[in-house]
């Protein structure tokens, strides 16, 4: 199916991936974008969401308390803040990573708001997905799995050595490989068995699932483009010449994408899990036109690119 954007930097370009069918069921996803390059992150997640077997409408948000340092005017014009959405409900929520995993949580300017987001999602979101730092922060705040800060960065593309259970998130996936770029780990030995999906004894958990709060936690970056790890490496080595190259990533000195198939299939499985949760609580999932008619907006007209 297709993705249509309610707001965001891509919205300025009337950006739509695929063919949007207004009579097909549509789910609403809140994407809390904590990454500094928000346009790139929008593109990365939008591409993955386009593989879901259902139409997706995305609302991009930033924390109200966060001091934005890049493209401030464009972000404030094209994003909503979390204060704008506390009264709303969403079918799904994705919270991205953030380059703050070397800071103490309490020093992050939106930490209190992030903790409120965790509590809010229990009553306002059907299914949640936390990536990299967001997973780290959620584990620390809610104490449902251990997190540990590292002095050296884990950087590269790694395959899970352990699949702990054949969860629906891993349907048609014999293994999991994804980019990792983090200064933290979730030690396998400290994680409750009910939460484990995929991981490694050395690198820690890759994927965790907590059915009690309808949440999935990914410690890496399925969404990364082929060049993202390379760009991070070039940024870091300009600051510290001793920065180690990302592992299992450069072949013949060129970045190689070996995770895309895993990423696309994982997001399809997550979308199907979300749809299953939604249909168990309601008889049907509304179409885009049904939602617009209920609001008195009439049928939708979309521009396809």
Swiss-Prot record:
GO cellular component: cytoplasm
Principal location class: cytoplasm
Protein's recorded name: Homoserine O-acetyltransferase
Database matches in CDD domains: GATase1_HTS (cd03131)
The organism of origin for this protein: Leuconostoc mesenteroides subsp. mesenteroides (strain ATCC 8293 / DSM 20343 / BCRC 11652 / CCM 1803 / JCM 6124 / NCDO 523 / NBRC 100496 / NCIMB 8023 / NCTC 12954 / NRRL B-1118 / 37Y)
One GO process term, biological-process aspect: methionine biosynthetic process
Gene Ontology molecular function terms on file: homoserine O-acetyltransferase activity; homoserine O-succinyltransferase activity
Family (UniProt): Belongs to the MetA family.
